[in-house]
Amino acid sequence: MRLFTKIKGLAAVTCVAALASSAAFAQEMTLKLGHLANEQNAWHLAAVKFGEELSTLTDGRIAVEVFPNESLGKEIDLINGMQLGTVDMTITGESLQNWAPMAALLAVPYAYKSLEHMDEVASGEIGEQIKQQIIEKAQVRPIAFFARGPRNLTSQRPITSPADLDGMKMRVPNVPLFVDVWSALGASPTPMAFSEVFTSLQNGVIDGQENPLALIRSANFNEVQGYVNQTEHVRSWIYLTIAESTWAKLSEDDQNAVMQAAATAQEYERGLLLESLAEDRGYLESKGMTFVEVDGAAFQAAAKDAVLANVSEEIRPIVESLFSE
């Protein structure tokens, strides 16, 4: 059951994601889960699903209040709140590298060849090392992971290999890793604010940009770009997390219930992601954009040295091994 309740002083709607199904069971605990996405985002819907499942599994004893749109605080503030015991849960990703350097592995360009490869890493030995470091150094416990849509390059001409970039002016985020990788690939990367991208494409200041399909769609880049080149250069994931201090208050049975509800939320979010990717592609194609397959191996090989030069010494051997897989 999802309830939407206006909370005074908050900028957005608070979703109460769980209620006791019977008056015979008294609510014992309410977990506050804040995140940055809006109510339509798959992460938010998965967070609500988590609350519903946890309520069912605990006979209504544990409720989850979901606060979207940064209404409980910005991402770093939420992590700090979890460490202080004022926030119970959030959805977060590579921001955790401020405490746990291995969290940078959540979004390394060309480290993951496919969604399946990323899943293997996130749920395997490397993923376990990342989670343990986050628990130890950030006092935040990852309990599920949500995949993000891969980033793709848009342009006014088809790009199938690094050679096709040939100095193409393209917008990138103001992140040294992105600038260096696209320079190594042969483009001319130009950091700029996202709010300036559409007009810059329209006026020819830049020739391309890179983002996930959902953002390409919502920003109406189909009006100023003709091609989506499926570079999929960044595959990444993000964690549903619970504060260690909150986790420690739970009985073993309730901890098991939390993990079971988190697994359900993870599966639910994956279904939403795949639906969204297919829907966004169909929409962009209907608006005239052409999807182009690229030589992924050639892009990865050209980007490797720049990626390795930009990651920390602690994770460099792992990144090198991922490139070799």
Swiss-Prot record:
InterPro entries: DctP_fam (IPR018389), TRAP_DctP (IPR004682), TRAP_DctP_sf (IPR038404). It comes from the Bacteria. Pfam families: DctP. Keywords: Periplasm, Signal, Sugar transport, Transport. One of its GO terms (biological process) is transmembrane transport. Residues 1-26 form the signal peptide. Gene3D superfamilies: Bacterial extracellular solute-binding protein, family 7 (3.40.190.170). Its main location: periplasm. L-galactonate binds at residues 75, 93-95, 148-151, 171, 211. It is found in: Periplasm. The keyword Zinc does not apply. D-mannonate binds at residues 75, 93-95, 148-151, 171, 211. One of its GO terms (cellular component) is outer membrane-bounded periplasmic space. CDD domains: PBP2_TRAP_Siap_TeaA_like. Solute-binding protein that binds L-galactonate and D-mannonate (in vitro). Probably part of a tripartite ATP-independent periplasmic (TRAP) transport system that mediates solute transport into the cytoplasm. The complex is comprised of an extracytoplasmic solute-binding protein and a heteromeric permease formed by two transmembrane proteins. Belongs to the bacterial solute-binding protein 7 family. This is Solute-binding protein RD1_1052.
